[in-house]
Design a protein with these regions (language model features):
Chain B
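The feature captures the beta-strand-to-loop junction immediately N-terminal to the Walker
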Residues: 51-53
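ABC ATPase nucleotide-binding domain helices that frame the ATP-binding cleft
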Residues: 59-62, 158
Length: 410, 373
């Protein structure tokens, strides 16, 4: 380093030293929030990622069996030592009541495995000595199947691709290759597509309805703008559940909306709105409107009224002035508003559950089902990861397309 | 034909007015008029400034002319034809806004080319015009920049170029230099004035800065409270303000309340608050109003010389404040029983005054003006 460089470094260090107290003060102010975010946001997401690939059951319940399977050729029926190890593991499992856990986990990949494991565990309890192989095979032929053993062996690792693959309608064949699941089992890509489609539709509707509202808000006299703003914000101050329930009431076949449609003779008979996708989209659009409007409004408000006037004075007719001068300048707000609504819509859960039909359930509904009813945390986490990745991908895509500086949330 | 000749012609032949306001009134709320009884002709090639304090209705007047606001009553004629039905884009009027209103999402060149596409000028012809317009305001090299990358002065020039590029018959400017620092403002004043003269543009310019108005204008319309208080060329406005508002708004003026005693020839005799009298010019003041004053500029008051001379008012008072300002001295004197009178004493006459010291001052009768409120 030259003398000048050393000087520069010294100055740099001196500046850092001089500003250290201010930096510490700033950090200490932000610390509670940082701690909160780590505990309440980062940690759960990490846990989600781990759960989506975690595979503890087989390892914990069948340690001896996995050990014995080490030397298995993978093609033939295993020999007696494997069955003996399995018997020993299942005895312990029976005592610890972990057999059900194992059965449930293996059942995801081999149907009927749950009851087979439980029945075998019950049988093993009564056996004192081997040889075990015939007894196992006598109880259930499939204990002799190399595929069963291949899957058990495969699940000996601490990580599994199973949940992620399932969430993407894929599965691993016993020989390890990845393939598409068949027919009516392939549901998750459909659900994902439907979720994206509904979110896109809701975003589009909120934009079409919200953009003019945001514009009127910026040009209306103060008093009227205040009242309009209140009406835009009011839904935000009402609980989501309450609003959704209100829509359930409104959308009934004998509800107000149908009454009005009938009274206006717009339809001859009552329209099925509740438990349909139309209903879901209507309710979600209503709930999401403020999220689209507010960023657009805030950007519009920052555009001086002289912009349109300047365009007119330079010769642009009103429509041309709007599209060439005004609309491009509102783009940051439009992108921010749409992104917000789209991403929030991807995670909708209560509204589709209450207003939508069985075929309108979104990814979140499945996540909830897997957590609450099936206790399948792995698959719930797998779906969660897919949703997270899709959301991030869309976010990054938007950033790429319009540039980070073009997104203004406030 | 220079401007003065044209103007004298114009007064004979009113058709030469490019713009005419006829009894224009404007109210936004239906209760208060912010522009009241506006009658004004703007002549071809003229630089007319609307000067007045904030809220006096200048912008409103300009907006009506530009087509962005409708007169509540009265008519605006452009080239002899009423324009009420004409939308802004059909008026072919250039408008430079207070905040420039450059389009932030376009480059400088795109900004300047914007008005051309609506006039059917595209491609190479448009490029050439943009180049010329930017050259005219010395911004040749900055065509690819965005407005946000320019300094305030440069943005101002872009706005100017964008307006001049389509050769409008009339250019309106609303406080275009308000956001610039003093030095730049003064340079831009001269540049704008030069452009206006060399291109022969008719200009209606709005400002609240009297020195700007005096520098640039052929004629100045002083606005106050929605009315034109006086319409005159800068010199007349400065020397012969027609009322107290104009007197105090343009330059500095001592305003001293008085009552009218009578007249001697063309000279009015005014009695001041303490009973002393002053002579003042002011032929057109009836003197019946209650609100009369004698108005005299500080630079027209001097320390009294030896001996009494004709044509001068002389009065005495006690020194209050003295500020030495380099080229001159400001001396405030309490005279006429409590009235503060400020005199601007040239530096070579400056001397020390003690607080309360008796001072005798004098001022020319023709420079004392009898004014009504
Ligand atoms: N769009 C508007 N709506 C209501 N009142 C306005 C509007 N524009 C101006 N005014 C009012 O009209 C008066 C004159 O304003 P303006 O023409 O902007 O004056 P200036 O340009 O001389 O400052 C002010 O009192 C202002 O509050
Ligand atoms: Mg104004």
């Amino acid at each position: 380093m030259t003398v000048a460089e050393i000087d520069r470094v010294n100055i740099f260090m001196a500046v850092r030293r001089a500003e250290r107290p201010a930096r510490r003060a700033a950090l200490s102010l932000a610390l509670p929030l940082i701690v909160f975010l780590v505990v309440a946001f980062v940690a759960p997401i990490l846990y989600l990622l781990v759960t989506a690939v975690g595979n503890p059951e087989t390892r914990e319940v069948l340690p001896r069996t996995l050990e014995a399977l080490q030397n298995w050729d993978g093609a033939s029926t295993p020999d007696e030592p494997v069955y003996a190890a399995l018997a020993a593991d299942l005895k312990v499992a029976k005592d610890n009541s972990t057999a059900a856990l194992l059965g449930k986990r293996l059942n995801y990949e081999i149907s009927g495995m749950r009851s087979r494991v439980l029945a075998t565990a019950r049988m093993v309890e009564k056996l004192d000595t081997g040889p075990y192989k015939e007894k196992f095979l006598a109880l259930n032929q499939d204990w002799g199947s190399p595929e069963t053993w291949a899957i058990i062996k495969r699940n000996g690792g601490s990580l599994t691709p199973y949940y992620m693959l399932t969430a993407l309608d894929l599965k691993q064949a016993p020989n390890g290759s990845v393939e598409r699941v068949q027919g009516d089992q392939a549901i998750f890509l459909d659900v994902l597509g439907r979720t994206l489609f509904v979110a896109g539709l809701v975003t589009l509707f909120t934009l079409i309805l919200g953009y003019p509202v945001a514009y009127v808000l910026t040009i209306a006299p103060k008093a009227i703008a205040g009242i309009m703003m209140l009406m835009v914000l009011l839904p935000l101050w009402t609980s989501l559940l309450v609003r959704t329930t209100a829509w359930v009431v409104l959308l009934q076949s004998d509800g107000i909306i149908n009454d009005v449609l009938m009274a206006l003779h717009l339809t001859g008979e009552r329209v099925q709105l509740i438990f349909t996708r139309v209903g879901t989209v209507i309710a979600m659009t209503h709930i999401q409107l403020p999220f689209t409007i507010l960023p657009i409004y805030s950007v519009m408000r920052s555009i001086p009224t002289t912009q349109l006037r300047a365009a007119r004075s330079l010769g642009a007719p009103p429509s041309s002035a709007f599209w060439r001068i005004y609309a491009p300048q509102t783009l940051p707000g439009v992108v921010a508003g749409c992104l917000m609504t789209f991403i929030l819509s991807l995670g909708y859960y209560i509204t589709p559950a209450l207003v939508g039909g069985p075929r309108d359930q979104m990814v979140s509904n499945f996540i909830s089902t897997y957590i609450n009813r099936d206790l399948n945390w792995g698959l719930a986490a797998g779906l969660g990861v897919v949703l997270l990745v899709v959301t991030l991908a869309i976010y990054l895509l938007f950033l790429r397309l319009v540039g980070a500086d073009k997104i203004k949330l406030g | 034909m220079n401007f003065a000749q044209r103007m004298s012609l114009a007064t004979d032949n009113p058709v030469d007015a490019l713009v005419r306001f006829e009894d224009v009134k404007k109210s936004y709320d239906g209760i208060n008029f912010v522009v009241k009884d506006l009658n004004l002709d703007v002549f071809r090639g003229e630089f007319l400034t609307m000067l007045g304090p904030s809220g006096s209705g200048k912008t409103t007047t300009l907006m009506m002319l530009g087509g962005f606001e409708q007169p509540t009553l009265g008519h605006i004629l452009l080239d002899g034809k009423p324009v009420e039905r004409l939308p802004p884009e059909k008026r072919n009027i250039g408008f430079v806004f207070q905040n420039y209103a450059l389009f932030p999402h376009m480059t400088v060149a795109e900004n300047v080319a914007f008005p051309l596409r609506y006039r059917g000028i595209t491609g190479a012809a448009a490029k050439e015009k943009v180049r010329q317009a930017l050259g005219r305001v010395s911004l040749d090299a900055l065509g690819d920049r965005r407005p946000a990358q320019l300094s305030g002065g440069q943005q101002q020039r872009v706005a100017l170029a964008r307006t001049l590029v389509f050769e409008p018959s009339l250019v309106l400017m609303d406080e275009p230099l308000g956001a610039l620092d003093k030095q730049l403002r003064e340079r831009m004043q001269i540049e704008i004035k030069q452009l206006q003269t060399s291109l022969g543009i008719t200009m209606v310019y709005v400002t609240h800065d009297q020195s700007e108005a005096l520098t640039m204008s052929d004629r100045i319309a002083v606005f106050h409270d929605g009315r034109i208080q006086q319409l005159a060329d800068p010199k007349t406005l400065y020397d012969e303000p027609s009322n107290r508002f104009v007197a105090s708004f343009i330059g500095e003026n001592n305003t001293m309340p008085c009552t009218l005693l009578g007249r001697e020839g063309g000279v009015a005799i005014a009695r001041m608050a303490d009973g002393t009298t002053l002579k003042a010019a002011g032929a057109n003041v009836s003197g019946t109003g209650a609100n009369i004053s004698v108005s005299v500029r500080p630079e027209n008051i001097s320390l009294a010389g030896k001996g009494v001379r004709a044509g001068l008012n002389r009065f005495s008072g006690k020194a209050r404040d003295v500020f030495f300002l380099g080229d001159h001295m400001r001396l405030s004197v309490e005279a006429f029983g409590g009235q503060l009178v400020t005199a601007r004493i040239p530096a070579r006459q400056a001397r020390h005054f003690a607080l309360g010291e008796d001072v005798v001052l004098e001022c020319g009768i023709s420079e004392c003006r009898l004014l009504e409120a």
